[in-house]
Every structure is written in structure tokens, then in C-alpha cells.
């Protein structure tokens, strides 16, 4: 039985989204239990034999500063949910709340794995191969060193190995060009570290990739700093929404375009389903000594259910142990990288 702790109060919509998503998730996963954390009255919206309610008196808002969430709101639904993981009561925690607060609280309570300096946020983006490309970091670390990018690559490889059943997932380093000479000093050094990792057998490194490679499916994993990754994620979601809106507008122009829309509906529906970012909701906070997943703050019930499913799959497939094992195997490489003088 897999047990997930859910921050029911987080995100833009709170229980209005999280509870319907939890109800739907339970219907499809008979071997799962949920610990719902939030206000007492709010939690009454979902009573189930495989649900436990844990009352929390505070809520971390989307505008709360990290210090407020971490130091002052010690009985927040977000913190109490993560505490369930620390105490061994839940296999994973899920929240749609404030990203900075979630990362800070998770790092404070769970700590990082040996050999990992900073956790990273990883999620999937759809690609032209009919699958998905895993990208990290997506906003946890705005500024990164080359050593951090190497650590992200190691953890991302473990994630893809577990969730996509790939023995040797292919890693790419996001850059402004494929050539080795391109990029800033951090990227150039990271490229060198990743090539060394490939030679030692710790990683399957493709080389530098560009932004379009994320969607072409050139590699399984794209590594970047959190600033670039977050911009790429939000830009892709914006483009997908723009395309959907443009198609709807054009097919609604007159009777003939409406008829064309009816004829083309099966194809258009399949395409839009592949591009629907809600299907890829649920980002893993990698590098912690416990499983924590972040949902979009604006997620609807369908999207939040996907985050629950990702957390469930990660727990069922022992993601934490496999990340820990891969990091331990790469420990000499990571230690050697940290020991190198700054360029």
C-alpha cells in the first residue's frame, strides 16, 4: 500500500481542486492511501476508507516569503504534509503551494542526500517522438555551478530510469549551440565534467543541446539552471495555449471552418492531448532524503491528479532508493568535481 501526504490547502484553488483530484485518484488506485492535510472544515469534503485527515492550522500562501513559511508557519498544511514523509508515515508528499517555501521546508525537514549540494525540480515536457523529455532544474536554483549541473544530471538519470524504464537515459546540457566552445564559463566547465562522467560510465552524455531539442526528443534529459529551465517551461506552456486558442478562433470563423473542425476533430483532439501541459503536471524535488512533488499552483483537478500519479509511481518504483544508489555510485566523480578549483 502506497501512502501519499497531500497539502490540500496549497495552490491557487486549494480544496476546490485538491479534493476532487484526490477522489478521482483513489478510484483508479485501489492500493493507495491518502493523508489529507489542511483545515478541519475543508477536509470534510472527502471522507473515504483509505483517507486519513490531519488538521493543520496554517496555510502557506503564494505570496509568503520563504522565511515566513519556514520560521513562522510551523503548523502549515505544507509543512505538516512533508513531516509525514520525515516521520515515515507517508511515502511521498504533494503540494501545489509556493515553490520557494516548499523547497525550503522540504530541504529543512528532509535534508539533502550525501553528495548533493542542492535539490532540483524536474518534470517532463512533451516531445515530437510521442514521449516526453525530462528537464531540470525548473526554478529551485537560479544560479548554479558546473558541479550542481553534474549533480542534476546524475539525479535526472535516476528519475528517467525509474519513471520511463530507460537503462541508460541520454543526457544533454542546454546551451546556446551544440559546439563545445559555446556557452559561458559555467556551461563550458559543466560540459567537461559531463564528458568525464560519460568516459567513466557514470552517465550517458550526448553533449550540448539547444532549446528546440527539448521538443524534438533529441535526448531523454536536459540539464540547465533553474532560471533558464523555468523560462523554458513557462514559454512552452504559453506557446501550447496560444496554439490551442488560435485553432479554436480560426475554426470558429464561419460555417465552413466549423464543418472543417468537425471533420478534423479526431486529429486535433489527439494533438491537443499530446500538448496539454496538465498531463505532465507533477515535478519531483530531487536530491532530498524523501519524496516530495510539486504541482502547478494553477492546476485544475485533472492536473493535480497527474501530480498524485507521478508521486505514486515514484514511490511504487523506489525512486528515492534508486536516486540514492546512483548518487552513491557517482560519489567519487562528484567529489572530484567539487575538488576542482573554480575557473
From Swiss-Prot:
Pfam families, sorted: FA_synthesis (PF02504)
Coiled-coil intervals, chain numbering: none
Subcellular location per the Swiss-Prot or TrEMBL entry: Cytoplasm
Catalyzed reactions per annotation: a fatty acyl-[ACP] + phosphate = an acyl phosphate + holo-[ACP]
The protein's annotated pathway: Lipid metabolism; phospholipid metabolism
Entry's Gene Ontology BP terms: fatty acid biosynthetic process; phospholipid biosynthetic process
Name of protein: Phosphate acyltransferase
Organism: Acidovorax sp. (strain JS42)
Amino acid at each position: 500500500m502506497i501512502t501519499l501526504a497531500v497539502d490540500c490547502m496549497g495552490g491557487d484553488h486549494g480544496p476546490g481542486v485538491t479534493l476532487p483530484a484526490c477522489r478521482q485518484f483513489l478510484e483508479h488506485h485501489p492500493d493507495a492511501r491518502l493523508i489529507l492535510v489542511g483545515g478541519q472544515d475543508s477536509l470534510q469534503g472527502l471522507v473515504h476508507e483509505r483517507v486519513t485527515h490531519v488538521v493543520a492550522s496554517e496555510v502557506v500562501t503564494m505570496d509568503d516569503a520563504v522565511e515566513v513559511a519556514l520560521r513562522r508557519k510551523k503548523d502549515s498544511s505544507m509543512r505538516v504534509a512533508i513531516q509525514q514523509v520525515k516521520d515515515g508515515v507517508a511515502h511521498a508528499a504533494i503540494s501545489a503551494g509556493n515553490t520557494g517555501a516548499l523547497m525550503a521546508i522540504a530541504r529543512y525537514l528532509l535534508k539533502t542526500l550525501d553528495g548533493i549540494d542542492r535539490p532540483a525540480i524536474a518534470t517532463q515536457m512533451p516531445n515530437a517522438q510521442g514521449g516526453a523529455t525530462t528537464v531540470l532544474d525548473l526554478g529551485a536554483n537560479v544560479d548554479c555551478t558546473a558541479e550542481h549541473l553534474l549533480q542534476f544530471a546524475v539525479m535526472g538519470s535516476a528519475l528517467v530510469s525509474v519513471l520511463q524504464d530507460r537503462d541508460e537515459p541520454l543526457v544533454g546540457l542546454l546551451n546556446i549551440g551544440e559546439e563545445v566552445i559555446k556557452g559561458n564559463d559555467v556551461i563550458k566547465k559543466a560540459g567537461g565534467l559531463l564528458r568525464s562522467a560519460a568516459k567513466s560510465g557514470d552517465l550517458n552524455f550526448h553533449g550540448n543541446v539547444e532549446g528546440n531539442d527539448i521538443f524534438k526528443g533529441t535526448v531523454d534529459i536536459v540539464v540547465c539552471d533553474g532560471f533558464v529551465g523555468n523560462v523554458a517551461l513557462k514559454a512552452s506552456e504559453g506557446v501550447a495555449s496560444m496554439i490551442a486558442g488560435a485553432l479554436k478562433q480560426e475554426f470558429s470563423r464561419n460555417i465552413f471552418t466549423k464543418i472543417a473542425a468537425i471533420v478534423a476533430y479526431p486529429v486535433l483532439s489527439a494533438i491537443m492531448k499530446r500538448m496539454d501541459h496538465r498531463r505532465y503536471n507533477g515535478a519531483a524535488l530531487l536530491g532530498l532524503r524523501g519524496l516530495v512533488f510539486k504541482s502547478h499552483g494553477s492546476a485544475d483537478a485533472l492536473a493535480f491528479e497527474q501530480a498524485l500519479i507521478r508521486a505514486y509511481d515514484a514511490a511504487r518504483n523506489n525512486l528515492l532508493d534508486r536516486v540514492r544508489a546512483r548518487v552513491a555510485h557517482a560519489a567519487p566523480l562528484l567529489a572530484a568535481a567539487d575538488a576542482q578549483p573554480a575557473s
